[in-house]
């Protein structure tokens, strides 16, 4: 299995807010000790996510598959049932991916995710597709350092399930991978 998590902290107009996600996944191949690869599927996993912020906790559970796609560092698809604290429960699909490549002696990485959730009686379907385009300047510090400079492009339709609340943003990015 694996684990992905992050915390965002924002401060605006004197208000301080935090949002986090913790996403542990349990590998059937890892638990069983058996190779369960078939076709492009490398593994099948139990997928969970805890989303939390000011005044809410959402719990997502379901299954995922890790895919073996040429040139991809990783590609996975997760299917969840979402128990939402403040809105009607829904379903979510999350795709995550990374494609490393070189230009001359420089290392680059394109990675990102796509979250799509279903519409329910009190909210619209939403789609958040965020991709980061990064250059590893860290290797000029040491071969193992992963310090990236780049840009992030985020397209978010019906943000927070609000119909017509759409964003299309490009941000500068400095990111360190542990």
Which residues make up each language-model segment?
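Outer-membrane beta-barrel "beta-signal"
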Residues: 166-178
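Membrane-embedded beta-strands of outer-membrane beta-barrel proteins
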Residues: 22-26, 61-65, 93-97, 131-133, ...
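Short loop/turn motifs that connect adjacent beta-strands in outer-membrane beta-barrel proteins
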Residues: 1, 12-14, 28-44, 68-76, ...
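Hydrophobic, well-structured mid-protein blocks that either form specific transmembrane helices
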Residues: 51-90
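Glycine/small-residue-rich interface belts in oligomeric ring/scaffold proteins
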Residues: 1-25
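Alpha-helical membrane segments in multi-pass integral membrane proteins
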Residues: 89-135
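Transmembrane beta-strands of outer-membrane beta-barrel pores
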Residues: 3-11, 46-54, 79-85, 99, ...
């Amino acid at each position: 299995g694996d684990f992905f998590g992050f915390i965002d902290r924002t401060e605006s107009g004197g208000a301080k807010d935090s949002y986090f996600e913790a996403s542990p996944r349990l590998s059937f191949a890892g638990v069983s000790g058996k190779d369960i690869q078939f076709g492009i599927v490398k593994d099948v996993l139990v997928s969970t996510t805890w989303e939390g912020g000011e005044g809410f906790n959402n719990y997502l559970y379901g299954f995922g598959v890790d895919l073996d796609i040429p040139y991809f560092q990783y590609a996975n698809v997760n299917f969840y049932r979402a128990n939402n604290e403040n809105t009607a429960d829904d379903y979510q699909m999350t795709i995550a991916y990374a494609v490393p490549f070189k230009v001359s002696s420089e290392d680059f990485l394109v990675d990102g995710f796509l979250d799509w959730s279903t519409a329910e009686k009190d909210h619209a379907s939403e789609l958040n597709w965020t991709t980061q385009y990064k250059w590893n300047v860290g290797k000029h510090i040491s071969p193992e350092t992963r310090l990236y400079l780049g840009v992030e492009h985020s397209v978010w339709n019906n943000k927070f399930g609000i119909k017509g609340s759409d964003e299309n943003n490009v941000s500068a990015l400095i990111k360190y991978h542990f």
